[in-house]
Amino acid sequence: MSPTKTQNSAEENIRAELGLSAEVVTIRRNAPAALLYEDALKERDTAISNAGALIAYSGDKTGRSPRDKRIVEEETSKDNVWWGPVNKPCSERTWEINRERAADYLRTRDHIYIVDAYAGWDPRYRIKVRVVCARAYHALFMTNMLIRPSKEELENFGEPDFTVWNAGQFPANTHTSGMTSKTTVEINFKQMEMVILGTEYAGEMKKGIFTVMFYLMPVNHNVLTLHSSANQGIQDNDVTLFFGLSGTGKTTLSADPHRLLIGDDEHCWSDHGVFNIEGGCYAKCLGLSAEKEPEIFNAIKFGSVLENIIYDPNTREVDYEDSTITENTRCAYPIEYIPSAKIPCLADHHPKNIVLLTCDASGVLPPVSKLTPDQVMYHFISGYTSKMAGTEQGVTEPEATFSSCFGQPFLSLHPMKYATMLAEKMAEHNANAWLINTGWTGSSYVAGGKRCPLKYTRAILDAIHDGSLAKEEYEVLPIFNLQIPKAVGDKVPASLLNPSKNWAEGEAKYTSNVKSLANLFVENFKTYQDKATEQVLAAGPQL
């Protein structure tokens, strides 16, 4: 079968860009999974699992490198970008050096892969993304994670809106101005390009596109980008957004047999409703089992990519309990591998419920509380949870951690911009907001408290979705001033709902623990208080 005109055009453009000879270099554009498997298996250590997934390894870097992320400081975007520890500036000269370094590396390869696909399921807002890389595993990963074009769309794809140059096998030059290591992940909003050097971790590509959408959607379209999962009721079409950091239950709780999954990680809220940014899921694998998370377990099959896992070399069976390489074992698969996925992944209904998830190891936050609009802004900007032992090197006891908008590493603009947009959209569409603690109750993790059982959290969500929880009688939790329901139907013990009344060491000890956590909130919020209203500041804990 002869290549299409667009196929030739895309390849010719890349050849011209890099100065490649047709005789020396093979370019594969939107190659099928079977072909990418064949190429990937030529790399050392790559294998196929007994379930049919491609097993690949990302080298030394098994997670993102946030300290090495940079935004090019240039005139079109510099007044919008939230500069600081999250978005460190680099000069246009440094960008040019690193982009050319990436191109130089790609010129040395005998195979180059192009993935042309979309970010954003709503055709009104989607962007055309081109990924250029040298590893078949990276090509399959992004084929899964982006929205795959139809044959007709691919033939008429044209020029991309944004291009990722992934030369991650090749290090950055540490003598280049502004380099702090051999890794750099750089985004240029003027050129609409991204360069990766010194890391083969595939998640950098996915989260790079996310950062781009965090910029383009609010700035160009007044569309709110969110680090959230989303689902929709099968009968009532009601949409729920779930915000939460790693380990809070965002993926688990959005997978509901009575609801359709719109997406598990990245979404946008427009004037028309909610749409997923991605065409796939990037699920954590540590501790995965068919019993606990059957939909994810069964999605690991031919076409999926297993990253940095340990397997039995004789049977090719994966050991999901083994974290020898990293705690951050992952699998990337197309979203249609999830039976409950809503395809296309968008809803023309606005969210009825907003759920902020936290895993509070101090045990002082209630299992559920109803939030006022100002409290939503405060807790959304705070983005609190507890970092559990084992999630990062050196963490041996739970630590309080804050990540603004529940996605600080990916934000392009000041957090207050996203929080204000969220509050405006919630007010316009009369959405309810809830803070759900999936962490400890009765006492802290350290003092022997118990984690809130998943069945009770699911019962709370059922009461939110059927509207009964909004009608319950409420009482106020002091200091944090949270509204706590006195009952959640007959599925959740009433004694579980108010931590001040069920604290194992008594109310005085509870109050002491509340004040300790409240102080952490107040200290963290000092970063944002210059742009916060008095009402939002008053919505936080009052000591």
Swiss-Prot record:
EC identifiers of the protein: 4.1.1.49
SUPFAM superfamilies: PEP carboxykinase N-terminal domain, PEP carboxykinase-like
Protein name, per record: Phosphoenolpyruvate carboxykinase (ATP)
UniProt pathway annotation: Carbohydrate biosynthesis; gluconeogenesis
GO BP annotations, alphabetical order: gluconeogenesis
Family in the record: Belongs to the phosphoenolpyruvate carboxykinase (ATP) family.
Enzyme class: lyase
MF-aspect GO terms: ATP binding; phosphoenolpyruvate carboxykinase (ATP) activity
